[in-house]
Amino acid sequence: PSVYDAAAQLTADVKKDLRDSWKVIGSDKKGNGVALMTTLFADNQETIGYFKRLGDVSQGMANDKLRGHSITLMYALQNFIDQLDNPDDLVCVVEKFAVNHITRKISAAEFGKINGPIKKVLASKNFGDKYANAWAKLVAVVQAAL
């Protein structure tokens, strides 16, 4: 699907679920960002190869580069949430985000591996499958740009 087609799947209910869960997840960008990344690495060890510049990711919060990447990731998600009501702007920021991943030869399928860790981080904050499915639809917008 095109990026616009994927963005069209973000219905009013999906946007509400994204915003409601983001209020909690986004309130601790550093902690939840590091949790997201360390869960990605634990569940999909092959993804560590894309992040060699981060050094020893097993250090978690003690790794400055991992913390920096995690915080940057969370602000990208904040940007996506902020643009949910304007599909043109959402596509613009998603495509900018996608460039960083295309440069590193990260495919749509590889990028989709983030859905499992997102589901786990959401579950740790008592957000169930409905919310994980909403985030998967947002991830699909990024995947369409890759």
UniProtKB/Swiss-Prot annotation:
Heme b binds at residue 101. It is found in: Cytoplasm. Keywords: Cytoplasm, Heme, Iron, Metal-binding, Oxygen transport, Transport. Its main location: cytoplasm. One of its GO terms (cellular component) is cytoplasm. CDD domains: Mb-like. It comes from the Eukaryota. Residues 9-146 form the Globin domain. InterPro entries: Globin (IPR000971), Globin-like_OT (IPR050532), Globin-like_sf (IPR009050), Globin/Proto (IPR012292), Mb-like_M (IPR044399). PROSITE patterns: GLOBIN. One of its GO terms (molecular function) is oxygen binding. Homodimer. Belongs to the globin family. This is Globin-1. The lineage of its organism: Eukaryota, Metazoa, Spiralia, Lophotrochozoa, Mollusca.
